[in-house]
């Protein structure tokens, strides 16, 4: 009996063992247990603090974490306190992941309690990968955090942010930052994008037949700057809402040619060939408000300022990019509009001062005034050259400038002779005319040597960029990158600051030394092709120039983006910091 009992005991034990062996199943945590998520708001409601507790053996992908306000297409940028780790993933290869925990900040404006934020993330563990998980959070349901870790996180990451990101971050933290944009505008007033507006303002105020007194001159200059600021503000908001296609549309050859014809007509009117004024019927109705709607009238000054705003609009600078980035991410049009207006007002103040002092210094009566008016006619002719240089082949720009300068010096010498000035001035004027006409002589007679021709046609920066046409080619090229960093330059022929980068920054020896360890890529955005639009939407590009930097995992390096011109020293230091 004992033997039978022992036999059946062994049989049942074996079956139980077999059952346990074949039925054993590896269990994985539920997604909310593997990646416990929580979120709070900062006290000023400008930051959403996200926290993940990650179970041991699990990890979240850095590039799979994203967030956006529901109903708005612009993503919210994430800044984390922890550094991501490199991980060899069986599904995605070498990637950056977070383990243990994440403290992250999404910047935005979260004042509306009914707004919702969508936060998406994805993680894995050995042998199992979770699908993307999305949390929809109502702003009014989030608790307000008093913890200081938020401020420390911001402080740590601010040093890594580009200038435009720091400016946008400043707007998120305090609305008083908008007044700092006025000071930034003062600095922008002396950039190549803003200086072309000076001759137009000077022609309106100083170039009249009857010189205005200081009060009237100030009023004309003030209205001109207000018109410029209004256009700049409205176009800035449109670019933030629509993106680069709007900026490109303003640079269409038809627009550039149309503006050039307008400025040529205004210049010819200053030479006395004809008078620009409204039809008599309409002019009579407006006489009570303004004596004449010529270039010196208040309405004309405001209108010319609005046109001048179009001239400056395509130039992207770090302050402008910061304001546009804030509007795009927050949707706060009021603060964005005020920021853009103060930026434009700062750009206009130096123009007003130069014009007012010029109005006071120059003679106020006599035949000399006709000469002054015609001089500003030549200055105004510089605007079409500036505009057409964006759409014509580069070789035409020096020819146009040479032609304008030659005609001016010949005219100036004749004026000096007519008014009985000394021979020395006439000789100097004719000599300068002979010097400036040389590019035209070379072009007409084709007398340049082979060496000169080679120098003319040599790329200014002498930097070889690999041209990229679409997102697929970009991904393939980044995947084969032999260097630790790749740089993508978004360029357009009409972009003045892009040409400054090429001529002044990329050609610098210390910058070229840094380029030796970087994969250099470039996309020509001039035609705004479907491929250009796809790249623009993928990287949320708001203006040109824009330079992007990528790591070896083909991800854009956070806070590394450059928008607006940067000189050689600053750009070289920027590249060193990225390494």
Swiss-Prot record:
UniProt KW keywords: Cell inner membrane, Cell membrane, Cytochrome c-type biogenesis, Disulfide bond, Electron transport, Membrane, NAD, Oxidoreductase, Redox-active center, Signal, Transmembrane, Transmembrane helix, Transport
UniProt keyword Cell membrane present: yes
GO biological process, one term: cytochrome complex assembly
Transmembrane regions: 178-198, 230-250, 254-274, 296-316, 337-357, 376-396, 397-417, 420-440
GO CC annotation terms, alphabetical: plasma membrane
Enzyme class: oxidoreductase
GO molecular function, one term: electron transfer activity
Superkingdom as given in the UniProt entry: Bacteria
Range of residues in the leader sequence: 1-16
Domain Thioredoxin span(s) in chain numbering: 449-579
Gene3D superfamilies found in the cross-reference section: Glutaredoxin, Thiol:disulfide interchange protein DsbD, N-terminal domain
Locations listed in the record: Cell inner membrane
Annotated S-S bridges: 124-129, 193-315, 495-498
Membrane topology, as annotated: Multi-pass membrane protein
Claim: Cytoplasm is one of the keywords in the record: no
Catalytic activity entry: [protein]-dithiol + NAD(+) = [protein]-disulfide + NADH + H(+); [protein]-dithiol + NADP(+) = [protein]-disulfide + NADPH + H(+)
Chief location category: membrane
EC number in record: 1.8.1.8
Database matches in Pfam families: DsbD_N, DsbD_TM, Thioredoxin_2
Function of the protein: Required to facilitate the formation of correct disulfide bonds in some periplasmic proteins and for the assembly of the periplasmic c-type cytochromes. Acts by transferring electrons from cytoplasmic thioredoxin to the periplasm. This transfer involves a cascade of disulfide bond formation and reduction steps.
Family assignment from sequence similarity: Belongs to the thioredoxin family. DsbD subfamily.
Name of protein: Thiol:disulfide interchange protein DsbD
Organism: Haemophilus influenzae (strain 86-028NP)
